[in-house]
């Protein structure tokens, strides 16, 4: 089978190209060569956090891999015979659990299996695990995919130590997703957590988010407050709007010197901003859905076309040909439809 060749510096030019490329290699059985990996970044090449996703997909598919070392700017991935497995990913730092799952979920959807990942559950520059559980999986369930994620322990920067387990059922009935504009909001949900911190931190984050959301919408607000223990302190909040179509989300992380009230308001404001265009899909979910839309079909309207989304469309089309139509400019609301 001929090898797919991907320029890793294209578009957003980050780790997402790697995650999507290797996941699609597993799904399609096509080997892939990725060059110029993170070429435009201050520290080019593979970083430790990228290795975890690649090695998890290697294990899932029995692949042969060349160039899988930190600093490498070229990776070759030759998928083997994929079968359902229990995948363990021990990230010894606060490396993102959810970025590993962004690589693992699309591939596992076609195979089934279970996973156990340690690392950072709520860390900068990646979706919080509660967003993945309550927003991403909610959308994937509408597409016929059944998956579960359970948080056993939180992990924050810099110590990590979080533990997430879950399973994915083989995706047998693929349902096209048509998610254009929402008409009404049924409720706001959320989870405010504080780890190795006083209980009032979670309460104050939740209270500030409730107050902010209620200024704009008169609907029920259910934000759960969670207090837990782990290797190090940290806090955060994820809020979502459950609409008549999908859920849209917003989130924020606490940090030393940042008042809990500011954290709660930040998450609420991010969600409120996503709601202004009435698009059914928020800007974070849009790019996550692209690999699944490729196989299920459908059309979505996103609150914002992002570089991540455009890049993910490009990567998918290197494997499957021209199947997407993207309408709208980066930074603006827009539509993504499957035409192939």
Curated annotation (Swiss-Prot):
Highest taxon of the lineage: Archaea
InterPro entries in alphabetical order: RNA3'-term_phos_cycl_insert, RNA3'_phos_cyclase_dom, RNA3'_phos_cyclase_dom_sf, RNA3'_term_phos_cyc, RNA3'_term_phos_cyc_type_1, RNA3'_term_phos_cycl-like_CS, RNA3'P_cycl/enolpyr_Trfase_a/b, RPTC_insert
Top EC class of this enzyme: ligase
Name of one Pfam family that matches: RTC_insert
Residues binding ATP: 102, 284-288
Annotated localization: Cytoplasm
Protein's name in the database: RNA 3'-terminal phosphate cyclase
